[in-house]
Amino acid sequence: MFTVIIPGRYASTRLPGKPLADIHGKPMIVRVMEQAKRSGAKRVIVATDNLDVVRAVEQAGGEACMTREDHHSGTERLAEVIEKYQFADDEIIVNVQGDEPLIPPAIITQVAENLANCGAGMATLAVPIVDSKEAFNPNAVKVVMDAKGFALYFSRATIPWERDRFNLSHDEIGEHYLRHIGIYAYRAGFIRRYITWEPSPLESIEMLEQLRVLWYGEKIHVAKALEVPGVGVDTQDDLIAARAAFRALNQEF
């Protein structure tokens, strides 16, 4: 069994008030919460810094935890919730991003089960990249793994770099590119240790907080997601796309 915590920071530079953005009649954070509840999690908690978000979650029958506004990352917000609820060190926590209203419940379950069985401090997921534009897009985080499925590195750069192919053209890519999905599973004790580590140089360069884990010698297990998640919402255009996706599904989530 596992617990899902959904960080729902209210302030957003590109999309202010994002957690409460309406998607087919419900706030986005409620859409994410409903997907998480379908994963089989024993508990789903929304961690936010805004009372309006708390009210929206509770009105929808969910559980919300009010957290500080000064956290620098979703992981720090999770750590506050873990301390408030006094979760045991071995409790499996799945961090589901609050801007993923179309996240498949199956992959939430998948990442929790992978953590339970892989022997790493942290587990996450990835999906194949088939489009060269995505491979060269710095907003699409790439990951490379070793033979046992443990992450070697995450980067905004195109990794691995196909020297011979890319010397000729950037229009086609091979079949070995993976895009990291921002879903994480870890035990509560691991998060308690993580927040005591100083940010690493690589993390600061790439602006990817998971690189802190590799920097300090911990392992991250990466598996291919059982399902490809729908659009995440980071901009107004993303929000329009998410609304269209829900309309196309023609069902209430």
Swiss-Prot record:
GO terms for molecular function: 3-deoxy-manno-octulosonate cytidylyltransferase activity. Pathway: Nucleotide-sugar biosynthesis; CMP-3-deoxy-D-manno-octulosonate biosynthesis; CMP-3-deoxy-D-manno-octulosonate from 3-deoxy-D-manno-octulosonate and CTP: step 1/1; Bacterial outer membrane biogenesis; lipopolysaccharide biosynthesis. GO terms for cellular component: cytosol. Gene3D superfamilies: Spore Coat Polysaccharide Biosynthesis Protein SpsA, Chain A. Its EC number is 2.7.7.38. It catalyses: 3-deoxy-alpha-D-manno-oct-2-ulosonate + CTP = CMP-3-deoxy-beta-D-manno-octulosonate + diphosphate. Keywords: Cytoplasm, Lipopolysaccharide biosynthesis, Nucleotidyltransferase, Transferase. CDD domains: CMP-KDO-Synthetase. Its main location: cytoplasm. The keyword Repeat does not apply. Coiled coil: none annotated. It is found in: Cytoplasm. One of its GO terms (biological process) is lipopolysaccharide biosynthetic process. Pfam families: CTP_transf_3. InterPro entries: Cytidylyl_trans, KdsB, Nucleotide-diphossugar_trans. It is an enzyme of class 2 (transferase). Belongs to the KdsB family. Activates KDO (a required 8-carbon sugar) for incorporation into bacterial lipopolysaccharide in Gram-negative bacteria. This is 3-deoxy-manno-octulosonate cytidylyltransferase. The lineage of its organism: Bacteria, Pseudomonadati, Pseudomonadota, Gammaproteobacteria, Enterobacterales.
